[in-house]
Design a protein with these regions (language model features):
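Beta-propeller domains
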Residues: 1-216
Length: 216
């Protein structure tokens, strides 16, 4: 229902039900989460957000058809202030023009402020094999500190599955490691396990493990 606002519930980690705060913002759609952390009483939620319904199997209450352009999600930061007397979001800030989903960070920084993020990108500027459709054909990278953003395109016959970050060593600095992602070839119906340097995804894979069947 596009006429209704969205609501975000915030409950202190050791709080009780009566401690929950509900914040609202104009209608938008969100699904997967990059990360969330607080700085003092302000809580930041980094999340891919789309203008309209991102899930075609949920019908619109007014019968409107599914709109692919409105379903494109972009990394966005929602900020609320738990100490505020207002029930409105403090801010909604778009973080990148690379639209996509299935984000990932260095999991060692979950619930703490993070510097790097990776996500699957739908790169509409690249060619695609008709049978593949407009799938998630690229891997995006963002450095929050420097503002650097880049991506790796898998190729016109490929779709990607959800990525995973692997630290180079248990004590490596944040973001020092590898992105591991399954890439599906829609023509051969086979998969590859692709490994990229997490800080240089634009340089392409450093290894490919070819699987003699399609995963999933």
């Amino acid at each position: 229902d596009k006429t209704l606002p969205i609501y975000l519930g915030v409950l202190p980690r050791n709080g009780k039900g009566e401690d929950i705060r509900w914040f609202k913002a104009p209608n938008q759609n969100a699904c997967h989460v990059i990360n969330a952390f607080n700085v003092g009483t302000k809580i930041h939620f980094d999340i891919p957000v789309s203008k309209g319904n991102g899930l075609w199997f949920f019908p619109d209450v007014d019968g409107s058809p599914f709109s692919p352009p409105d379903a494109m999600a972009f990394p966005t930061r929602w900020t609320v202030d738990y100490a505020s007397k207002s029930d409105e979001f403090e801010s909604v800030k778009k973080l990148s023009d690379m639209g996509g989903e299935f984000p990932r960070i260095d999991d060692r920084h979950l619930s703490r402020e993070h510097r790097f993020a990776w996500w699957l990108v739908i790169d509409l500027s690249k060619p695609f094999t008709a049978s593949a459709g407009r799938g998630m054909n690229a891997l995006g990278y963002m450095d929050y500190q420097t503002g650097r953003q880049t991506s790796w395109w898998a190729g016109e016959q490929y779709h990607m599955q959800e990525p995973c970050f692997v630290p180079r060593t248990p004590t490596s600095p944040e973001g020092d490691g590898y992105i591991v992602v399954v890439v599906d070839n829609v023509v051969t119906n086979l998969s590859q396990l692709v490994i990229l340097d997490a800080q240089s995804v634009d340089k392409g894979p450093i290894a490919r493990i070819k699987v003699p069947f399609r995963l999933r």
